[in-house]
């Protein structure tokens, strides 16, 4: 699943091609994604200019004068920029939506169709008030995210520290891959109860989350199965994993074999020596 780095890489890749440009038309080939695409979306967006593209957690927010269309990549979604002059590229089986601009097509592809394309009209209020966004935690690169915040919000909680990271109620965008990698950098075992982690260790974890996500964005994200950036290129951060998907291999720091456990039906990887 695309996590925050992959979504941010996508945002940075597509914004120069769509920001300030007029949507000439929209072609919806598959209206039934995770939720139905609004039937009048193509009519609503025709002739509108995209003001900017922002990210909130794993959601991409495209602002026009009348509101925002929201894109979530789900498990296997990608957004690619394709040149359609002089000849538009043919759509493949899993290419569900095209936003067509003067020279480029923004194409949404999603083999498993767990993603979403939604509409939030301006009269409904700020887009951050949308039900899918209103309850999200803080952004990991914002000043609001800190070890003190995590420490305060986890007091008395028995859920594991990894599950607390994944929940998205404290900090957004940290999925399974980057939770495992961040906990390794912070030296914290993923099964440790969130309420038992000290403030000092949460300070280390907050720094580790920021460092891990920034490094992943710099490498274009992780490509394990489906993810490619807006230009069709794969990310390379998976080559730098310390623990994720490395069960049985030696720790890059101490040489101890990496262990794999299951938490909440997801695989978790850690070094039993470096993480305590």
Swiss-Prot record:
Alphabetically, the GO molecular function entries are: 8-oxo-7,8-dihydroguanine DNA N-glycosylase activity; class I DNA-(apurinic or apyrimidinic site) endonuclease activity; damaged DNA binding; zinc ion binding
Q: Which residue spans adopt a coiled-coil conformation according to this UniProt entry?
A: none
Name the SUPFAM superfamilies on file. Answer: Glucocorticoid receptor-like (DNA-binding domain), N-terminal domain of MutM-like DNA repair proteins, S13-like H2TH domain
Question: Which GO terms of type biological process are on file?
Answer: base-excision repair
Chain intervals annotated as zinc finger (FPG-type):
242-276
- Catalytic activity as recorded in UniProt: Hydrolysis of DNA containing ring-opened 7-methylguanine residues, releasing 2,6-diamino-4-hydroxy-5-(N-methyl)formamidopyrimidine; 2'-deoxyribonucleotide-(2'-deoxyribose 5'-phosphate)-2'-deoxyribonucleotide-DNA = a 3'-end 2'-deoxyribonucleotide-(2,3-dehydro-2,3-deoxyribose 5'-phosphate)-DNA + a 5'-end 5'-phospho-2'-deoxyribonucleoside-DNA + H(+)
Asked if the record carries the keyword Protein biosynthesis, the reply is no
Q: Which co-factors does it depend on?
A: Zn(2+)
Alphabetically ordered keywords of this record: DNA damage, DNA repair, DNA-binding, Glycosidase, Hydrolase, Lyase, Metal-binding, Multifunctional enzyme, Zinc, Zinc-finger
Look up the domain of life of the source: Bacteria
What are the EC numbers? 3.2.2.23, 4.2.99.18
Please give the name of this protein.
Formamidopyrimidine-DNA glycosylase
Species, as recorded:
Paraburkholderia xenovorans (strain LB400)
Annotated gene: mutM
């Amino acid at each position: 699943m695309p996590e925050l780095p992959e979504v941010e890489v996508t945002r940075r890749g597509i914004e120069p091609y769509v920001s300030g440009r007029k949507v000439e038309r929209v072609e919806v080939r598959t209206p039934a994604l995770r939720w139905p695409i609004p039937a009048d979306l193509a009519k609503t967006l025709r002739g509108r200019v995209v003001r900017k593209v922002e990210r909130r957690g794993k959601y991409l927010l495209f602002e026009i004068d009348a509101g925002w269309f929201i894109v979530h990549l789900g498990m296997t979604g990608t957004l690619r920029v394709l040149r359609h002059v002089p000849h538009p590229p043919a759509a493949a089986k899993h290419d569900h939506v095209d936003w067509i601009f003067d020279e480029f097509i923004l194409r949404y592809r999603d083999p498993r169709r767990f993603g979403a394309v939604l509409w939030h009209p301006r009269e409904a209020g700020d887009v951050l008030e949308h039900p899918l966004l209103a309850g999200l935690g803080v952004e990991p690169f914002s000043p609001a995210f800190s070890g003190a915040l995590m420490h305060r919000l986890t007091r008395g909680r028995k859920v594991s520290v990894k599950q607390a990271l994944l929940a998205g109620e404290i900090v957004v965008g940290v999925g399974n891959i980057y939770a495992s990698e961040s906990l390794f950098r912070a030296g914290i075992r993923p099964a440790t109860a969130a309420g038992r982690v000290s403030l000092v260790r949460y300070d280390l974890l907050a720094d580790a989350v920021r460092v891990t996500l920034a490094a992943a964005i710099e490498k274009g994200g992780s490509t394990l199965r489906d993810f490619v950036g807006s230009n069709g290129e794969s990310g390379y951060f998976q080559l730098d994993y310390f623990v994720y998907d490395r069960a049985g291999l030696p720790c890059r720091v101490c040489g101890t074999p990496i262990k794999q456990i299951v938490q909440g039906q997801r695989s978790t990887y850690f070094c039993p020596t470096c993480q305590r």
